[in-house]
Every structure is written in C-alpha cells, then in structure tokens.
Amino acid sequence: MEEQVANAIEIASNPSADPALKTQAFEFVNQLRSDPSGWQVCLSLFTQTPQRSGIVRHVALEVVNSAAQGGLIDLQALAYVKDGLLAYLRQVYGQDAGASDPPNIQNKIAQTITFLFSALYASGWESFFDDLLSLTHKSPSSTTRDNASGIIFYLRVINSIHDEIGDVLVSRSRNEQDKANALKDLIRQRDMQKITSSWQQILSEWRDGNDVIVEMCLKAVGSWVSWIDIGLVVNQTMLDLLFQQLGRAQKEDLRQGEEKVRDAAVDVFTEIIGKKMKPEDKIDMIIFLNLDTIVSQLSNSPPLHGNRFTFKYDTDLAETVAKLVNITVIDIVRALEQEGVSAECKEKANGLLQAFLPHILRYFSDEYDEVCSTVIPCVSDLLTYLRRIAKVNPALASQHSSILLPILKAIIAKMRYDETSSWGEEDEQTDEAEFQELRKRLGILQQMIASVNEQLYMEAVSEMVATTFENLRQSGSQMDWRDLDLALHEMFLFGDLAVKAGSLYTKSNPNNQAAERLIEMMLRMVESDIRSFTHPATQLQYMEICVRYSSFFHHHTHLIPGVLENFLQLVHHPIKKVKTRSWYLFQRLVKQLRQYVGNVAQTVVEALGDLLVIRAELPSEVSEGDEMSSEDHDLADAIFNSQLYLFEAVGIICSTPTVSPDKQVLYAQAVLNPIFLDMEKNLEAAKSQDERAILQIHHDIMALGTLARGFSDWMPGTNTPATLPAPEVSAAFNQVAEATLVALESLKSSFNVRTAARFAFSRLIGVLGSRILPQLPRWIDGLLTQTSSRDEMALFLRLLDQVIFGFKGEIYSILDTLLTPFLQRVFSGIADPTTGTDDEIQLAELKREYLNFLLAVLNNDLGAVIISERNQPIFETVISTIEHFSKDIDDFTTAKMAFSVLSKMSSSWGGPDVIAEASNGAPLAQAPLPGFGQFMITRFSPLCWALPSTPSFNSKDAQAKQVLAEAGGLQRTIYAKTGMEYLTYLRDRELPGMGMGAELIEEFVGALSRLDLKGFRQFFPVCLSNFHHSLDLNMNN
C-alpha cells in the first residue's frame, strides 16, 4: 500500500506523466485524504528510513494534517501520531541528527506539531515544551543550547503556536478564541518561565553565531510579549541582550542577513510598547526603556544618518524605527487625552511628546513615502488631540504653534514631487497613484492643522505660495516645475477654507480672511506668464484652479480674456492626457463665466475648429504607437467623450445673451454644416452595415445633441426654460432634429445610432421647445423598434414623461395620435419572454416606467387621451396590464405603483366626490366617464384583495404593507366617488363572496365610511390580517 501511495504521489506531481495516468493518480491521492485509514500509511511514509523523496514526504504529511484537522483522527490516534513524529524529530533534529529537513518540510511538520499542541497540551502532552526544548541540546548532559537545527525547529514551532493562539489579526470563532485563551493560560501557568529562559539562553549563546537563530528568537519574543507577563521580557538580562542586537545598527557594513536581526530587535521594542497597559504604566514603560535615547541612537546610526540621501540609505530600518516612533507617540497622546489619568502622568507624557517631536518630524519628512506613511497615524492622533483641546480652549491653539508649524512645514514639503519623479510616464503610473494617495492623506492632516490654528495655516501657505510666484516672476521657465506644482496644489486645497457655497464671495465681499488670501494668490497666478508653466502638471493645475475658483473672475472680469487665451492654447496640448482633460475644464470654465464670454464667440469657434473634426475609430484602428498617459485615454471612445465637452462649450459661448440671434445662427452653422456633410457622406456606407460609418454617424449625432445642450440650460425633468432660444436659432436646430431623424430612420436597427438619437432628442427639447412635438411619431418609430431592448423603452418612456410635463398644454393632439402604436410597442416589450436575471431587472424597470408614464399623463390633466375615441381599442389592454401588475407577488414596488395608477384613474374619471375628502388631494375632477363608477366597483375593488390572498403573501413584510396601504387608498377613493353604491356592493356581494363573516363585514364597511383616507390606509392591513385569522380559525374548526 505504501508503495502504491508513493507512486501515485510521484505520478501526480510529474509534469511529463501520461495525462490519463496523472488524472487517476490525482483522484487516488484525493480519496486518500478522506479515507479514515489513509493517514496511517502517510505517517509511515513520512517517518520511514531511508527517507522518501521530498514531494512524497510533503504530500504524505499534508494528508496527515488534513486528517487531523478534519476530525478523522481521534484523541488516542493523535497520541500515536505524536509519538511517531516525536521519535522522528529526535532522530532528525536531536543530538545525533545529520542533515535536517528543507524549509518547506520543516514548516509542514511545525504545522502538524502545532495542531497536536492545540489538541493534546491540556491533556495528553503536558511535556510538550520539555520535549521540544530537549532538541536544542546536542547531548542530554549539555547545559547549553548548542544544537542549531533543533533550536531552529523549536523556534519555528514557538512562532507557529503564537500564530495559532496569540495573533490578534487572525479571525477566530468564539469557541476557537475560548480554546486559545485557555491554552495561553495553561502555558503561563506551566511553562512560560522556562520558555523565556530558553530565549535568553539562545540569544546569549548565539548572539554572534547564527543570524537565522537570533532573528527567529527575536521574532518569538516580539510576538509572545503581547500576551505574557511583561516582566519576563522587560528585565535587565533580556534588555541587555536586546540592546546588544540593536548595536548592529551602528555597523557600517553588515553581513548578509544581519540587517534582519537588527530590524527584529527594534520590532521587539515596538511590540513591548504595543502591549495593552494602563496609560500610567505605559508612560513609565516608555521612560524605563529610555526609548527617546534608543530612537535617537538609531536615527543617528550610519544606515539612517550617514547614508541618508545616498543609495546606501536603509529604508527597511527607517520604516522599522518609524513603526516604533508611531506606536510610542500614539500611546503618549492616549495618555494625554484620556480622562482619569493623573496630572503627574500627563506631565510626564507632555515631556515625552516634546522629546519625540523631533523623531516624528524626522520620519514624517523622510524622503521615502513608505517611511512617511508609517508615522501618519500618530501625527493624525496628535492633531486630533490638539484640535480637541483648541475647541475646549481656543486660547491654547497659539501655544501649540511650536508643534503645529514644523508639522505643517513637513506636510507641505512631503506634498512636493521628489527629484526622481517623472510625471506622466507610463512606467511611473503606479508610483504616481501612490503619491496622489499620499497627498490625500497629507491633505487631511493639513485640514486638521487648519482646524486647530487657522491663522498659522493661512500664513504658512500664503507665504509659501507668494514666495513661489515671486521666484517664478524672477526666474520664469527656469524654475523647477515641482516647486510651482506644490504652490498650485496648496492653492487648490486652500479653497476648503475659503470657498463657501461654491464661491469666494458673499454679496460681493470675500467670504472670510482665507478667501482674501486666496484672491491674492489668484491674482499672482493669473497675472503670471503662462509660458512659465512649462510642465504639463502645472498647466493642468492652472486650469483646475481657474475652474474651481471661477467666482474670482466675476469680480476680476478684465482677466477673463487672458485666461481664455491660455485655455485655448492648452486645449491644443501635445500630450493627450492634458489635452483631453483641458477640454472638460474649458467647458466648465465657460459655463461658469457664460455672461462674460459672448464677445469672444467668433474667436473661440475659429480657434477650436480643428478640434471639432470628428473621427470615429474602431478599437482595431487605434494606433499602437499612439502615446497616451493613462488607461482611460488609451480608448478612442474616451477621447471622443472628452471631445464632446468642446461642442458643449461652443454652444454655451455662442448662445450668450450678448451674441445676437443672427450671429448665434452663424456660429452654430459653422459647427453644424461640417457635421451634416459628414453624416451625408457616411450614410450610404452605414446602411450597408459598415461599422466605422455607423460609429461615425453615432459620433456625429452625439456631437449635435451636445451642441444643443450648450445652447439651452433646460434639462429633462425640469420645467421648460423661461425663454427659449430665438426663433432663428430654433429653426437652425430644427435642421439638427431633421438630420438626426433621417439617420435614425435609415439606421434604426443600430443600437448605437438609437442611443445617440435618444440623447440628441433629450437635448433638442430645450432648444426646439414645442417645435419638437410634431416630430414625436417619427422619434418613436425610430427609437422603439422590433430590436429595441426593454432598457431602451424604459429610458424613452422616462423622456416622454418629461416632454409631457414640459408641454402638457400643447401635446394632447399629438399624444392622442401616437398613444396606441406607442403603447402597443411597450406591451410587446413587456410580453417578451425573459431569460436570466438581467432580463428580469429590465422587465421590472419597464413596467415601472410604463406605470410612471400613465401617471404622468393623468397628473398633467391629459387622462382624456387614454379614453379618447382613437385610443378606445387599447383601453382594455391598459387596464388589464395594470390589473396584472397589481397582483404581482414578486414585485411589490410595481404592485404599489399599479394601485396608485388605479387610484388616479378613479379620481380623474369617477366624477365629482359624493363623499367628502377626495383621495390624493386631487384638484377638481374631469367630467365623469359614463359607467366608470360601476367599472371601478366591479373591476378595481376586487384587486385590493387579490394580492394578499396569494398563499405566499407575507403581510408583515415592509413593502407588502405599503402595497396594502395603497390598495386601501384605492378603496377609499372608490367610496368617495360612488358612496352608498359601493358600500352596498361590498356588503351584499364582494365581501360575503370572499367568505368574510357578517361581523367583520360591518366593521370593514363602517371603517370605510367613517375614516379619512389616511386612517383607512392604516386600517386596511389590520382588517386583512383579522380576516385571514378568522379564515384560519374556520378551517381548523
């Protein structure tokens, strides 16, 4: 059997083995894992002499592990495994050992031994640590820990035990944590003294002999210290040993691996300080350990001081020391801010804070971002503490300037690009993203400083920015771009303090002192020569700042032409990342300064002409050599989406009130006519399904719609603009609608063309106003085709709601004409079968938009169109779909909306109220629809009981309750319109027919006639529950 298993493992792991044979071997080994006796064979395979191959032994031990952890080995058998492995350990790692196992096998044995410890240490293997410690001697009579392989294995297990029971980062169940705690208690009670003594012996005897042993031992001390008696580690003997290892930091040249020992020694101190203690004890511990001196010595050591700013600088040690500084300062601050801490302790903590401030600044300002990031948590805690003090006593804020100012200066310095950074290069993207993330974190710290001492923050930043612009004035393009970028970045952040409600001003006056400072900075920046902004990063910052603080230009209008000229240069930037971002920023700027830019409309249209040429590119056409700075800009459609901002910007500038209507038309046509010609040129190819031609027409239509958006502020969902564009302008855009419709009618099978046309339609509404209404049938015919998805239908329904809302006084006749064919397409979309979750989501959305459409018609006094002579044939289908939705147990949202529509129909067509309090707070109802009262009673009323009668209906569900409340509202509306006729019908026919008892019927009818709308909506769910309860009782009887 052993040979069979060994062969199977060899075959399964052999890359050149026959695939069929290999599959069989895999299956055999996997079956072995679940075989209750498989572990016995594998234990023998692992321990036998001569040793099997490494892969056989590794897999065999893995099977034993799996069986033990999977519960296939009982306690008695575990003792057998323990004995077998212990004998093996004594043979391989003990006094007569030869070569020990490779690291992967050692790790696997340590894992198994750790599991056996968890299972048997409490009962069955009480001598666990004695047995392992025996491996550390070369002979039983030896008094020194002199067996290197045994010591390494012992320490490997020690560290593995901590991972199993002591590591707080490991997630454990409540039972697992209880077991871990019990094992820790047992160790502390039985063996902790001898374990810590063993560490002292190992560190003493091997301090210069074997770096691997010393590093492993230090890691053990550092990990275990969090849950053992601190006195076992913090004693003179152990501290002397630790200080010896720290001494390695003073060496100029370390042998390979020695730096790991040094860093592990520092980590021990970090773990000691990280141990949970009372604030008083922690402060005393920091003082006792003399951590200030330790950190000073480490900071002044050759790797961190002598080699700083050279390629030999030891960043690993810097980060390790920074961790120690971080945890120490966090504890110092905690002692300062916690209530109940003695005055004496706080005084000591204050002294320590002053002592550690240079250490904080040293590592916070480290040129390596990883080191700086390590101390950000303690800086954040410190600033949070100072902010809390300043809130309680603002007078103290100035006293802390000695702490705040150096930290602020360090923050500002760290926000600067370092000398080695290469902005925008493809292979630097990860570094750039990490630096921007660091800037965000630093920005938060800077805000905290501003909240503690605003004046100090304003003065420091103002001085830095002013100095930078003065240097720029003197040195011009010779200035280091990193300095200018830093000043601009600080200006951008400064707005968090200066801007209120999106502006620097309140009633023409600066918001506050910060706004005054920022206005001064803006003047310096805008009056600088843009040619001095030689770097793309500073050019982008310039534009971002102009856009963010556009309110500045409302009060300095004389500067606008110069800024626009600068932007028009930058929108032609050779680097695509800058160019495409500048297109968006240009649109933002002119939108915010619309009232001041009309006088340069012609200049802008001419300057942007070359950028308004549309060239659609299929993915395969994008040139591989086309240099772009980020993934977003590698895609041609992303560039086109940015290009659209230019079309909107042109529309904004050309449509300002200072541009006469005839000039508006002239400028618009200068942009429109090339697009019309392009559409005409590509239409025939597009009809022949040429993909590039279709995409070109999609782009053309999107550009037309975006230009229209620039010409009108109107957005779907809002009322029509107070003043539409001049008739001449609307006439020009009527050509846009016509060109779009011609393309749509020819290419309506294309999803892309339909998408673009729907976008254009939504934007043309604001420019054409009611002129668009006669075209509605053509839009519907093109946008709702046989191939249109439910999503497209839902989106168009939403647009139509907005058209109805905007033009309710003018749309009736057109709506009357198009309603039947339009709704028939919607009904077809609803009826189509669904395949998969996405389809079901789209169907639910379409149902809701259909109901929303009906509500829009009814709410805008257009309900007559649904019951007009022309649309009479589909009335029954409209009602039946709503009835069907009201009974949908799987979609409460739609069911609730269905009842809302029925209530609105009832209040609209049911005639005047015969009972006070009409539902929905509706205005005067339309003329009653003959026979509709009886129709409501016989068709609508029973629906209120249909959904809750479904077996799976849960009346306690929150959404279900909302549906019932809406159904109750419908019943109250029917009663308001029909009065006693409805009560009689309920009493004599509907309720008895459902099996409702006479007493409950009278209660229901009485409540309906007595309660108002709100009261009955609350009553109906309760009544329904009582009714179902009575039915259950009758069935049981």
From Swiss-Prot:
<dbReference type="GO" id="GO:0016363">
    <property type="term" value="C:nuclear matrix"/>
</dbReference>
<dbReference type="GO" id="GO:0005643">
    <property type="term" value="C:nuclear pore"/>
</dbReference>
<dbReference type="InterPro" id="IPR013598">
    <property type="entry name" value="Exportin-1/Importin-b-like"/>
</dbReference>
<keyword id="KW-0819">tRNA processing</keyword>
<keyword id="KW-0820">tRNA-binding</keyword>
<keyword id="KW-0694">RNA-binding</keyword>
<dbReference type="InterPro" id="IPR016024">
    <property type="entry name" value="ARM-type_fold"/>
</dbReference>
<dbReference type="GO" id="GO:0008033">
    <property type="term" value="P:tRNA processing"/>
</dbReference>
<keyword id="KW-0963">Cytoplasm</keyword>
<dbReference type="Pfam" id="PF08389">
    <property type="entry name" value="Xpo1"/>
</dbReference>
<dbReference type="Pfam" id="PF19282">
    <property type="entry name" value="Exportin-T"/>
</dbReference>
<dbReference type="InterPro" id="IPR045546">
    <property type="entry name" value="Exportin-T_C"/>
</dbReference>
<comment type="function">
    <text>tRNA nucleus export receptor which facilitates tRNA translocation across the nuclear pore complex. Involved in pre-tRNA splicing, probably by affecting the interaction of pre-tRNA with splicing endonuclease.</text>
</comment>
<dbReference type="InterPro" id="IPR040017">
    <property type="entry name" value="XPOT"/>
</dbReference>
<dbReference type="GO" id="GO:0071528">
    <property type="term" value="P:tRNA re-export from nucleus"/>
</dbReference>
<dbReference type="GO" id="GO:0000049">
    <property type="term" value="F:tRNA binding"/>
</dbReference>
<comment type="similarity">
    <text>Belongs to the exportin family.</text>
</comment>
<keyword id="KW-0539">Nucleus</keyword>
<keyword id="KW-0813">Transport</keyword>
<dbReference type="InterPro" id="IPR011989">
    <property type="entry name" value="ARM-like"/>
</dbReference>
<dbReference type="GO" id="GO:0005737">
    <property type="term" value="C:cytoplasm"/>
</dbReference>
<protein>
    <recommendedName>
        <fullName>Exportin-T</fullName>
    </recommendedName>
</protein>
<dbReference type="GO" id="GO:0031267">
    <property type="term" value="F:small GTPase binding"/>
</dbReference>
